[in-house]
């Protein structure tokens, strides 16, 4: 099997790490690879913030649904959708004045711009994950970074047109990870379609959705059910 494909198939989330610092050379290799990630129009609508301050890591662990392993991870990195850089560049380049002379207002970033920037940031994040995996460094995505984005903005100094889309924890997997099974996935027939989207639940009833990858339970259930679209599943 192609070694890249094998690496992708074997990848899993790692939440327990060796007490071992990531050397700067490894970080540099990961970041250099990340900056070559595909990006819309070569705009690179994202920013990367390395969290080295322990107090900030402790705060993020609490803000992200009280997950203590975040505070213990050797390398914690925020990937943010960033339209602020281009907005500032437009203003600095005199676009606002040009618009004023034309009798028009300078357009501020809108929802479509945010979605495009989020896509850029997530593509970059996944590139970092695979680059790290190739060096034997595990990782775990933290989506909860979005849940308290106002407090995260204050903590990390994010400006109005910067949105924290995901946090990544990196580190060398400890011995407890060696025998850990990979989580299951839906079968391909439930995910991959040809030419047109298929709403499976309408075609063959609820059973056609397959077996869930995990059962949602515990104190997070109520909050999850309040998420947009959850009631329609």
What are these regions (language model features)?
Residues 1-233:
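Acidic, surface-exposed loops and disordered segments
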């Amino acid at each position: 099997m192609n070694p890249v494909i094998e690496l992708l198939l074997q990848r899993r989330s790692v939440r327990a790490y060796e007490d071992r610092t990531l050397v700067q050379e490894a970080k540099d290799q990961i970041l250099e690879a990340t900056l070559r990630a595909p990006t819309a129009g070569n705009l690179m609508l994202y920013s990367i913030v390395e969290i080295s301050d322990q107090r900030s890591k402790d705060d993020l662990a609490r803000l992200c649904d009280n997950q203590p392993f975040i505070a213990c991870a050797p390398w914690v990195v925020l990937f943010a959708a960033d339209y602020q850089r281009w907005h500032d560049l437009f203003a600095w380049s005199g676009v606002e004045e040009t618009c004023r002379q034309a009798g028009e207002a300078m357009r501020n970033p809108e929802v479509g711009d945010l979605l495009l920037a989020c896509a850029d940031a997530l593509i970059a994040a996944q590139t970092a994950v695979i680059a790290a995996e190739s060096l034997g460094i595990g990782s775990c995505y933290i989506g909860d970074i979005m849940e308290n984005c106002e407090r995260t903005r204050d903590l990390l100094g994010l400006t109005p047109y910067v949105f924290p889309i995901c946090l990544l924890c990196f580190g060398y997997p400890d011995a407890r990870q060696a025998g850990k099974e990979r989580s299951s996935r839906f079968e391909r027939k439930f995910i991959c379609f040809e030419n047109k989207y298929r709403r499976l639940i309408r075609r063959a009833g609820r059973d056609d959705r397959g077996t869930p990858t995990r059962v949602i339970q515990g104190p997070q259930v109520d909050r999850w059910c309040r998420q947009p679209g959850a009631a329609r599943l």
